[in-house]
Amino acid sequence: MAWELLSVIGIIAFAVSGAIVAMEEEYDILGVYILGIVTAFGGGAIRNLLIGVPVSALWEQGAYFQIALLSITIVFLFPKLLLKHWNKWGNLSDAIGLAAFAIQGALYAVKMGHPLSAVIVAAVLTGSGGGIIRDLLAGRKPLVLKAEIYAVWAALGGLIVGLGWLGNSFGLYVLFFVLVVCRVCSYMFNWKLPNRSFRLDN
């Protein structure tokens, strides 16, 4: 039950973030719903394609889709009311979603007997793939590739799950907590990976 609750928090966070980006880009109501749904479920869809799970399995998550649609509707109807609280709790909710989705993606891949590399990729795509698709559809540079450390924490979760270091559910919850704390610290202290800017002069 607790794991389902964490997934719901993640779905709400991702759906809301997609809807907010769509409204920032002045998309119409259809665009708001599409970007919200893609952000919440896009990473899982790509993961399923790569690890051999039928994409149609996503349609079995009817309750999650309803939650996402309701969240997007609330954002669209009452943006100011929600954003007042979103600025305070949005990053934490997003961190919860990242950790929960990354671990779930890794567990999917392990269950299907995939190698470690596939487990890590599944974790990264499930945790951050939706955000990447959201930014690309909005014509933005993917934030997860240039802002505070984000996808790395999903990869770390996939690595630990793939190596089989967690023997029970308690271990998974410990990993979840660690990933959430790491992500929260990333945006609180502006942790970033090294980067190098290069422009070719004409």
Curated annotation (Swiss-Prot):
The record's disulfide annotation reads none
Keyword entries, A-Z: Cell membrane, Membrane, Transmembrane, Transmembrane helix
Mind naming one GO cellular-component term on file for this protein? Answer: plasma membrane
Q: Main site of residence?
A: membrane
Location(s) in or outside the cell? Cell membrane
Superkingdom per UniProt: Bacteria
> Where does the sequence pass through the membrane?
3-23, 26-46, 63-83, 90-110, 113-133, 160-180
Membrane topology value:
Multi-pass membrane protein
Q: Which family does it belong to?
A: Belongs to the UPF0126 family.
Q: What is the name of this protein? A: UPF0126 membrane protein YvgT
